[in-house]
Amino acid sequence: MTKYEIPIESKKKKSARIPIDKLHDFDGHPFKVTDNEDMDKLVESIKLQGIINPLIVRQKDNTTDEYEVISGHRRLHASKRAGLTEVPALIYPYTKTEAAIAVVDSNLHRERILPSEKAFAYKMKMEALKEQGKRTDLTLSQVATKSDTATAIGKETNESRDQVFRYIRLTNLIPELLQLVDEERIALTPAVELSYLTEQEQYDLMSTIESEDCTPSLSQAQRLKKLSQAGTLNADKIFAVMSEEKGNQKERISFPYEDIRRFFPKSYTQKDVYNAILKLIGDDHMRRERARKNRDER
């Protein structure tokens, strides 16, 4: 544990059963709750066994019976779907700043975290640690620099300080581009370069991506950033850069993603779908090869 962390166990708590309509998402929490196969399983589990692990919550500021969820957003959503009217919870006396840190720390252990979730989680924690550093009643004795906090976050998540900063840069992307990063259509490094484009430039880029069915390589992203910083980037230049054939670009077949997505589990990412398709093609190729050899041996 680092000097920046606030262990949940160190806080006095009380248990309670809280009506679901009195529970609210923590303001700005970065973790997405989606209805997929895993969520369906959680709903069925709650219907059969109830909630095994209580939610962790804090009382909302200036209220007496309203609460913010620190840990358990998925359980809360599943409970609503399961028809529950109240859930077990542990109420901790967190300040807003402590709560922000706890929200991030309690969710970063998940098996799969999207780049957008990491981006806003790291940003939330960095801002909270910065605020915490200004308080003498919390764990930091002096204001921490961005470098200090990024290093601390990196140690907790097994990432370098620079990688933490890269993820935080993604929060400057428009939602449409950030979605492409989550879908693994744009890699992290090119996405960081694109984050330096203005909002309008990003929307112009998105228009070209949609019309030309292409995404920028690192080289293209770097050129777009350079043109933007020079103040000369416009829709025409974006189109010109994106229309250039990439060095390793080869002829390809494309089709709407939605046409095949329905054949795979909801929990599959785009990469999972891609790998499954390759396996199916590979299995079919091996089957045809075996059939050919059998014919040749006759």
Language model regions located:
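Amphipathic, charge-rich alpha-helical segments that serve as recognition/docking helices
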Residues: H77-N172, Y196
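Amphipathic alpha-helical extensions and coiled-coil-like segments
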Residues: R161-A276
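Short, charged/polar connector segments at secondary-structure boundaries
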Residues: M1-Y92, E98-R112, R288
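Glutamine-centric residue-chemistry signal
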Residues: Q49-N53, Q132, Q142, Q202, ...
